Structure formats: C-alpha cells, structure tokens
C-alpha cells in the first residue's frame, strides 16, 4: 500500500486538475451549484482490468512494463508488479477534491477511505476516476459519474457502480466501484451558523493536524514598527485602549531574553538587518551579531532558510540567485560560529517523475516565517513563545505606517534600500514601502509552531558539495528532558475566565517531503486529517481555515493579501487552469446568500497595485490576468444574486465587494535645472537614469507593497500567516506555509450578543486608521452600506490624488483598485488609465504563454 499515484501528464495536472476524456452518461445532464460539503466513502473496486497487459508495447526494444520495472529498481522500490496498482481520484468541475491511497498489485482493491470535502462548484456530475499508478505515467482505467441533480435531493447515494471506459462501456466485465456520497448544503450545516468565534465551546476548525488550543495570549502587529502616537487611539471594551505593537523590537527583545533556544524559519533571513532602529543608533546590533552573541551564551540557535537553487557558493565563485534571498551570504556569515544555519531545498516527492521533481525544486519554495524562543514564565521556569506572520527577517521589510518613499533613505532605511520594480538606488529612490502583518503567540499553540519547526528540521537535508558533511540530527533540544521548560500541558497563559484570553489554532500548507513525523500508514494519516497526494501526505489546513471562517462570517470580511486569485473552475474561460482554491468563490457565494436573505454584508480586499517586479513583464502580466478573471467571476456572481431578488436597479456589486491597493506620494524637490536630482538638499547625478526612474522622481509617487497575508472576520476572528491567496500557497504540495487563527471567546458576537470590541476590533480599526489616515464612527460597522460607500468614496479620492499630474502630499494611502466595475459586475480597464502610472503594464493583465504553475 502506498500514498497517492504517479505522474499523469496525459489526463490532467498534478494535484488539482482531473480532465475526464470520456462520457459517463448518454444524455445531457443539468448543471447544479453544490455549495456545502460532500461526505464521500470510496470503499472498494471489483474485477479491475490488468493494465500491464495494455502496456506491453515496445519502445526502443523495451516494453512499458519492463521500463517501469527498471524505474522502480532505480528508485529502490520492489519491482514485482503483476497487475494494476489502482487508486481513485474524486473530481468536480475538473478540480480534484479527494484521492485515495494506492493499493499495489490488486484487481480487487479495498480502500474504505472517507472524505469530508467542502465544495462550491457548478457541475453536472461528480467523477470517481479509477487509475493505475505507474512511474512512467498513471493511466485512467475508467470512470463513475454521479449526477449532481441526484445529490441535490440530500439523500445518500451508495452502491456498486459500473466503471466505464472511453467508449462509455464497462472497462471490464463485472468491473465495479463501491462508493457512497451525500451532499449537505450550507444552509443545513450548523457549524457555519453561529459565527467564527462562537463562544467558549467553539472547537475551531475541525479536521486539521493541530487542534484548537485554549488559554493563550496573542499580540497582533501591523508593519515591522509603529511609533508611539502616530496612529489614532482605539478604545476597546472594558475601558482598555488598543496598544500598537512594535514587531521587530519585540522580536529583538525576545532574542535577548532567550536562555535555551532560538529557532528561526524564513524564505529569506539576512544577517545585516537591524531589528531596532531608533535615530539610526549604531549601537543597536544587527540580527547576525545578536544571534552570535546568544549562541556564545549557550543558547541553541537554529536557522532554517529556503535554499534558492539559483544561488551558489563555491571557493572563488558565488551567485546571488534570481530571488535575491541572500541565503548563501547568511550561511557564510555564520559558518564558523555556533549558530547552525541549514539551507533547505524544496524537494519533490519520492516516486514523482523527473519533470515533477524538477518543477517542485525549481519553482516552489519554503515560505514559512516563524521565530520560536523560550521566555520567562512563573516560578522561575521557561515557556515557549512563537512569532508567526508575513515578515521575513531580511532587507526591505522594515517600515512604519507612514510608508515613506524618499524621506527615510538616509535614516531608517540607510543600508536597507529595496525596490526591485525598476532600476534605482538609495541615493535617488523611491524605495518600495512595505506593508505586512505579523503575530506573537504566548500559550499552548506556540508549542505547535515549535513542533512544525522540529518536523521540518528533521526532514531537511542540505544540497550541494560539502553541505552534507555535518549531521543536523542532534541539533534540536529535547524540550521534554529540560525540567525548567514548561510542557504543552502546563503552557496555558490565561484561563477561560480571563476576558483577555485567546483560543488559537495553527494551520499549515505542507506535505510529507518537507516534514518528518507524518504517519507512514495512509489509513493512520487519514486519522491525523492528512490528505493523500501522489506518493505524499498533505496538510492543507490553511485552506480549510479560510473556508471555515468565510462560511461562518455573518457581517463582514476584511482581507489583506499579496495575491488574490483562485476558483478558476468557475471562471468564464480557462476553467481548467488548476487555480482551484475555494476562497474567491466562497466570498462571492457568502455575499450572494446575504443578498438573498436581504442582510447587510461586505467584503473589503486589499492587494498590491501589482505583484512585485516590472509590471510589464510576462509573469506579472499573467498573474494580473488571472486576478482579473477572479474579480470578474466574483462580481458576476454577486450581480446574479441582485438580479434574482430584483435589487439590480437599486444596488450594485460594489455595494458589497471592493478591491483596494495602497500608494503614497511625497512632496519634494523633483528636478533641478542642471539635470541633477536633489535628494536631502544634496544634488547627485543619478546613475544611468531610466525612463521609469525619471518618471517616478517626477511624479513623487509609488505603490506601498502589500505583503500581508491576513483576514479579519466580524471583528471576532483573525488569521495571519505566510500564505498568499493563490494555489502555490494553499495547495499544500507547492510552497510550504504556516498561519495562526485566533479569537477571544469573551469578545465574540455569540458571547456578547452585540458587536465585539476586543483586540481584533482594535487591530482592524488600527489598520484602517493607517490606510485612511483617520477614523470615523462609520468604520466601526463595516457591513453597513454607509461604511462601504464611504470607504469606497475615500479610496476613489485618494486614487485621484495619486494619479493626478499635480504632486500633493497624501494623508491617506488606501486607493480604489484602478479598474472599472459596472452595475452588471463587468470588470474592465479604468477609462484613461489602462496601464499603471509611471511604470506601465496593463492593469487587467495580458494572457501570455508561460508555465502555468509559476503564476497561479
């Protein structure tokens, strides 16, 4: 028995797409929307054909079966294959929603595998595709189709069904699949009817690897630093005033106070970065110096960084790499110290084809951003505290809510200039402002973040000549053997009677190639809520957390994310792209259902003006094209609901859903008569000025890059992590990710019976204060139409100021995303502004030929 199947280039994409090249019904079937959950059992198959018989055709004198035997021998697998190695994929609208494990050498396999799957798909059938696993490419044995019309009755459909071949006939006499399937629509699911943080008894997100942990505390951060007094005060319940956290200062303080361990994961970790920046005080050490000092004090310091395959370091030769993560430079800095740095490549799964392994190792990354330390606890003991979010400890990330373009180049951002969108320098600018979200977990859930680090560290293997000589197996401290460090069961930092206590849950996108500790037995893995992929096990709990929170939302959703694309199965074209995450469709259907119920609801989504890089480049134009398709699908879903209830003449889709971006503009001397550029009253010749740089200096404007990965629901639930809203971050087999979701049980709608005003309310209001420049009472009720229209009005005014010829100082940064949405939900270019100011590139993107998995 093994997990998942082999590669399948012939019939579909790797994990998320299953094209069915045959008819399972002789007549036309009605397309139905399934929005809810499918409860599925794939039980067993009988009398499957022996697929080896179909493969014994010669290729260069070698039969397919012999070729497969040789491949398995190279991979170290047993080569005794006499018949089919069957497994089953379950798909709807071409999107794979479930996959059984492989049973080797069996024509009568028994799986007895259960799936409880969220769906938001329009389809005529649910397909059960029986396949034969093989190293040179899985083959479809046959298909069973269950009409969605039958499922909509709500009755359980079960029994033995004939497995049909490409001719619509049984693939073999007596070939049958035993299955059971039942559809439960959203309106009948109690799990989603009481809100996200439904009181003390809430169980969190069910079916995940890490459970909900009660009795914690959470600190929420916006940007790397917030100066005192720069944002308006926000008053919370209980007479408390919201405190704006100082993320990097808190992280530096946590490092200094650590006595036992400091564990860091990152997409990038850069040793020269300064976490504390007050008046550019040179006495504040760099991250690298701080970690070396702590290591010399006896603290175990482990740093786990993604190994960019394009960066290399050999004696006398080194390359930075395409992604500029400085991984090799950081490794060299710590080489002769007691700080242990492990550059961790992204590896493909065992049994994957060479093409698939190459794709994983060159395209996908380790994207988690965490720091775990021991901290002071009661009775002279220590406890585990964890930081989780979107901020890497590297250059270009430090910023404040002011998001200056030019004014901090010689102070806060001296030696930390970052703008990869076009060629410019720190002498000239503008820098790329950076907006991000982060969190600190104090309590039992911090131990799950620690467990994630330990599982990843044990699975990581260095790459390259000389990198494998040191053993990393004994580097991890055995926490359970250190008496002064509290264990998980002792770690509660607050009880349920404390009004400031939190319930927190840790989520991941990761697979068994990147962790050590997942169960070997696929059936046991199912009990740990892991999914089967092709020869791997998958934790997709970040996606599950987003879906559960959106479905439970009763009032509003506020999202900040670096990317926003998905639900391609419901686009008007490119349905088979494979960007199958449910998040955009779930938001659109949530709004549509609220419209039908004639209840207020609003979604606010903040994204970057464009993905980082040259907006005219092929990859970015293609991402923008997918983003446009996603927006179009959502707005049209909302318009259909308005039309259905007869409100299309009174309301429009933007009364419920709005997209925004962030930008800034700074007044200052632009160009002096002799052609030099005046920066800080010190004229300098710009090095080889280019058109984009000249235009940006003239206009004194630039986007604020939204790197956030977070969501607030109903001011009672927050989700913050490293995952973007795209397939790369949510599928579990691509980029590795981590996130936290949490709420305060005493500050929920269920507990109060009215609007909660706890820490999450304060956080969301503080973010709005940063983006809009001030607060109004209307902002306290985001679901109300008055608030939606007011925020949109302000964002349109800000966009007008940003795009104007005249340079004026901007007090608000929230810009209406520059597309036009008409009353029928059609999304098109903004008249007179089809391309991005200064840098160009179509705002709605272009369909360009490029490897799809790179851009979704």
From Swiss-Prot:
Deletion consequences: No effect on tolerance to aluminum.
Stated induction or repression of this protein's expression: Activated by wounding, heavy metal, methyl salicylate, osmotic and salt stresses. Up-regulated by aluminum stress.
Residues reported to bind a 1,2-diacyl-sn-glycero-3-phosphate: 367, 562, 707
Reaction equation(s) it catalyzes: a 1,2-diacyl-sn-glycero-3-phosphocholine + H2O = a 1,2-diacyl-sn-glycero-3-phosphate + choline + H(+)
Keyword Metal-binding: yes
Any one of the GO CC terms: cytosolic ribosome
Domain PLD phosphodiesterase: from-to ranges: 362-397, 702-729
Binding site for Ca(2+): 223, 403, 435, 770
Summary of the tissues where the protein is detected: Highly expressed in roots and flowers, moderately in stems, leaves and seedlings and low in siliques. Not detected in seeds.
Activity sensitivity to pH: Optimum pH is 6.5 - 7.5.
Membrane topology: Peripheral membrane protein
Cofactor detail note: Ca(2+). Requires micromolar level (PIP2-dependent).
UniProt keyword Membrane, yes or no: yes
GO MF annotations, alphabetized: calcium ion binding; phospholipase D activity
Active site residues of this protein: 367, 369, 374, 707, 709, 714
CDD domains for this protein: C2_plant_PLD
Known regulation of activity: Inhibited by neomycin.
Domain C2: 21-161
A Gene Ontology BP annotation from the UniProt entry: phosphatidylcholine metabolic process
Assigned EC number: 3.1.4.4
Compartment(s) where it occurs, according to its Swiss-Prot or TrEMBL record: Cytoplasm; Membrane
Cofactors: Ca(2+)
UniProt family annotation: Belongs to the phospholipase D family. C2-PLD subfamily.
Summary of the function given for this chain in its UniProt record: Hydrolyzes glycerol-phospholipids at the terminal phosphodiesteric bond to generate phosphatidic acids (PA). Plays an important role in various cellular processes, including phytohormone action, vesicular trafficking, secretion, cytoskeletal arrangement, meiosis, tumor promotion, pathogenesis, membrane deterioration and senescence. Can use phosphatidylserine but prefers ethanolamine-containing lipids as substrates. Can use phosphatidylcholine (PC) as substrates in the presence of phosphatidylethanolamine (PE) and PIP2.
Domain notes: C2 domain is a calcium-binding fold, and the binding promotes the protein association with membranes. In PLD gamma, all the calcium-coordinating acidic amino acids are conserved.
Name of the protein: Phospholipase D gamma 2
């Amino acid at each position: 028995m093994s997990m998942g199947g082999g590669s399948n280039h012939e019939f579909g994409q790797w994990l998320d797409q299953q094209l069915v090249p045959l008819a399972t019904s002789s007549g036309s079937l009605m397309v139905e929307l399934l929005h809810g959950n499918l409860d599925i059992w794939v039980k067993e198959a009988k009398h499957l054909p022996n697929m080896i018989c179909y493969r014994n055709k010669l290729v260069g004198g070698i039969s397919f079966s012999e070729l497969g035997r040789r491949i398995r021998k190279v991979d170290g697998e047993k080569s005794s294959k006499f018949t089919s190695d069957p497994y089953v994929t379950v798909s709807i609208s071409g999107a794979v929603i479930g996959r059984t494990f492989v049973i080797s050498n069996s024509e009568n396999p028994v799986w007895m595998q259960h799936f409880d799957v969220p769906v938001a798909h329009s389809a005529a059938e649910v397909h059960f595709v029986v396949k034969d696993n093989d190293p040179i490419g899985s083959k479809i044995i046959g298909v069973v189709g269950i009409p969605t019309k039958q499922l909509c009755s709500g009755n359980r459909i079960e029994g033995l069904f004939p497995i049909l071949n490409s001719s619509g006939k049984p693939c073999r006499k007596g070939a049958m699949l035993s299955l059971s399937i039942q559809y439960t629509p959203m309106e009948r699911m109690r799990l989603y009817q009481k809100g996200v943080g439904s009181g003390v008894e809430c169980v969190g997100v069910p079916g995940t690897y890490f459970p909900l942990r009660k009795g914690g505390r959470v600190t929420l951060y916006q940007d790397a630093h917030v100066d005192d007094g720069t944002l308006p005060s926000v008053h919370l319940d209980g007479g408390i005033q919201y405190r704006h956290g100082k993320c990097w200062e808190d992280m530096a303080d946590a490092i200094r106070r650590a006595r036992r361990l400091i564990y860091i994961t990152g997409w990038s970790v850069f040793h020269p970065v300064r976490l504390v920046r007050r008046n550019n005080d040179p006495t504040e050490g760099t991250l690298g110096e701080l970690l070396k000092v702590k290591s010399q004090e006896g603290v175990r310091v482990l740093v786990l960084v993604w190994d960019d395959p394009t960066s290399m370091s050999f004696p006398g030769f080194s390359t930075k790499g395409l992604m500029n993560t400085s991984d090799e430079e950081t490794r060299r800095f710590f080489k002769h110290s007691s700080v242990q740095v492990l550059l961790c490549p992204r590896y493909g799964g065992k049994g994957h084809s060479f093409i698939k392994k190459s794709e994983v190792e060159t395209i996908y990354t380790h994207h988690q951003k965490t720091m775990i330390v021991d901290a002071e606890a009661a009775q002279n003991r220590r406890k585990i505290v964890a930081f989780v979010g979107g901020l890497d400890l590297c250059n270009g990330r430090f910023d404040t809510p002011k998001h200056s373009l030019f004014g901090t180049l010689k102070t806060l951002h001296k030696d930390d200039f970052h703008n990869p969108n076009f060629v410019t320098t720190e002498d000239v600018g503008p820098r790329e402002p950076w907006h991000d979200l982060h969190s600190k977990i104090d309590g039992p859930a911090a131990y799950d973040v620690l467990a994630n680090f330990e599982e990843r560290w044990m699975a990581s293997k260095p790459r390259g000549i000389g990198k494998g000589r040191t053993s990393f197996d004994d580097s991890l401290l055995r926490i359970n053997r250190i008496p002064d460090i509290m264990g998980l069961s002792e770690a509660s930092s607050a009880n349920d009677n404390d009004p400031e206590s939190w319930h927190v849950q840790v989520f991941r996108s990761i697979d068994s190639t990147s962790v050590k500790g997942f169960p070997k037995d696929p059936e046991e893995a199912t009990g740990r809520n892991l999914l089967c992929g092709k020869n791997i096990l998958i934790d997709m709990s970040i996606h599950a957390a987003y879906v559960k929170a959106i479905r439970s939302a009763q009032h509003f959703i506020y999202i900040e994310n670096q990317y926003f694309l998905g639900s391609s199965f419901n686009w008007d074209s490119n349905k088979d792209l494979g960007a199958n995450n449910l998040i955009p469709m779930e938001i659109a259907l949530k709004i549509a259902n609220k419209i039908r119920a004639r209840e207020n609801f609003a979604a606010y989504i903040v994204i970057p003006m464009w993905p980082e890089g040259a907006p005219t480049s092929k990859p970015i134009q293609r991402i923008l094209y997918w983003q446009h398709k996603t927006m179009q699908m959502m707005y049209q879903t909302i318009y259909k609901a308005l039309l259905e209830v007869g409100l299309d003449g009174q309301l429009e889709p933007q009364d419920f859903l709005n997209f925004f971006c962030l930008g800034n503009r700074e007044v200052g001397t632009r160009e002096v008569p002799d052609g030099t550029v005046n920066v800080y009253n010190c004229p300098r010749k710009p090095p080889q000025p280019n058109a984009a740089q000249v235009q940006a200096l003239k206009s004194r404007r630039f986007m604020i890059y939204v790197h956030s990965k977070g969501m607030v629901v109903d001011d009672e639930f927050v989700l913050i992590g490293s995952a973007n809203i795209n397939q790369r971050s949510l599928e579990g087999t691509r980029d590795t990710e981590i996130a936290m979701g949490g709420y305060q049980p005493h500050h929920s709608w269920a507990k109060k019976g009215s609007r909660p005003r706890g820490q999450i309310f304060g956080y969301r209001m503080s973010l709005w204060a940063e983006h809009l420049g001030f607060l109004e009472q209307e902002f306290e009720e985001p679901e109300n139409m008055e608030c939606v229209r007011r925020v949109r009005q302000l964002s349109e005014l800000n966009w007008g100021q940003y795009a104007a010829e005249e340079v004026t100082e901007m007090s608000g940064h929230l810009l209406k995303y520059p597309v036009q949405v008409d009353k029928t939900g059609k999304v098109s270019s903004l008249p007179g502004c089809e391309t991005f100011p200064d840098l160009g590139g179509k705002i709605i993107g272009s369909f360009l030929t490029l490897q799809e998995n790179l851009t979704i």
